Structures are given as structure tokens and as C-alpha cells.
Amino acid sequence: MIRHSKTVLQKAHELEQKKNYTIRIGVSLMNPAAILLKQWKQASILYPDVRLEIVPFEDTVPAFLEVLDNLGSKIDLLSCPYDTKHWGDRYNSFHLMDLPLKVSCSKSHPLAEKDHLTLEDLYEQTLLLANRGLNPYTDPVWNELESMYPQIHLKGVDYVDIHLFNQLVTSQELLLSAECWDSVHPLLTTIPVDWSFTMPYGLIYSKNPSPELLQFLLAVGQVESV
């Protein structure tokens, strides 16, 4: 099993023969791949033999888990946050960057006009975030805010999906979010917060990747994060 970026790069370097091939990227509203495509725009200059194909899939938990279980079949990889216990041990991961956690809210929310938020801005607000134990990047948020900022009301959710974003439009609640979801809903806005919380973002792919996919990971890995 190839789990770490360095191992992927070492394996990909062993590939000597270049040929034209297609990498199929799964996309949905919650997994738009915009960050990957920005990075690939730079790498593609050096790898003109690689073609990308966008494969849409439904934004539901069953559909997402089916994609994970069949990576390498109709879809080669996803570009999204990763390392969550909710998905289980279904895939390999290639780290691209750590994204700062932000806050999303309705454009009618009193905080929506701010360019950035302080923790004091969140006082007496309700912040939605993944339940404890679902992933390693929201647990520190729970720990710090509960112990040091009890004025912020925390509310756990089992899954962040498009339905939750839709509910947020008519709610006064806030949602823990990130740059990769900036454009998920046109009636929501996403605002940076004065804290240091981040989440890992990268590519998830089959446990048995093809040589072509390894070559693609090498190409993306050679480009500095955008």
C-alpha cells in the first residue's frame, strides 16, 4: 500500500516510458477539484501527454462511499479534504496542502459583511462542525473552543453535505468550512477566522494505482501549492 507522498514520488520516478493517457477526476458540488486544477495548470506545461477527464457524481453519502470503494474503475481520484474516520480505510492519499479552516454563513447573517472574523465575533453564535471523533482536524477545534471560549456555542453534525449548506441559507448558524467549499452555494459566504486550525487537503486514489496515475501524482507534486 502506498500511503505517503514521498513513496508515491519515488515510485513515479521509476516510470521511464511516456505515453498519452487520461486521468479521470471525480467531481461534485462538495468536491469541485478547483484547487487541483489550478495546480495542474502549471504542471500540464511539462506533461502535455496527460489529459484530464471530469467525471461528475452525486453528492450523497452512499454515492461518495461507492466512489471510494471503486476508485480506479470509473474514477481515478478525488481532490478533497481527507483523513476522516467516517470513510474508513478505503483509499490511498497524496497530500497537497493544509487549508485554513474558515466559517461559512448565510449572506444575510450579521457577520457576512466582515472580511475576517475574530473569536470574539463568534461569541453567542452557534458553530456547526463535525462531531467529535469523526476526523482529527475538528477535534482540536472542539477542545480549544469548549475550554477557552465557552461563549461560542458548538453543535456537532454527522456529515457536512449540500443539504447542510442549504439549511444554512435560512439559518443564523455558522458552519466550520474551508477554501475548497467557497463556491459550493451562491447564497453563502466563507470568511477567514483569527485562529490556526487547518485541515489536510489532497488527492485520494486507489490502493492499487496504475503507473499512469503515479506519473500524474509526480507531476502535481512537483508544483508548489497555490
Where do the model's predicted regions map?
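Secondary-structure junction motif
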Residues: I35-L36, W87, E124-Y149
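Extended ligand-binding regions for polar small-molecule ligands
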Residues: I2, E120-Y123, P200-V226
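Flexible hinge/capping segments at coil-to-helix
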Residues: D89-L101, C105-L127, L214
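Ligand-binding cleft/hinge of the Venus flytrap
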Residues: Q39-P48, D69, Y137-H153
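Beta-alpha-beta core module
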Residues: G88-F94, L99, H163-P211
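Alpha-to-beta junction loops
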Residues: L68-C80, L101, Q167-L176
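Central regulatory/effector-binding core of bacterial HTH transcription factors
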Residues: N20-K85
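Short helix-loop hinge/linker segments at domain boundaries
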Residues: R3-G26, S44-I45, R90-S93
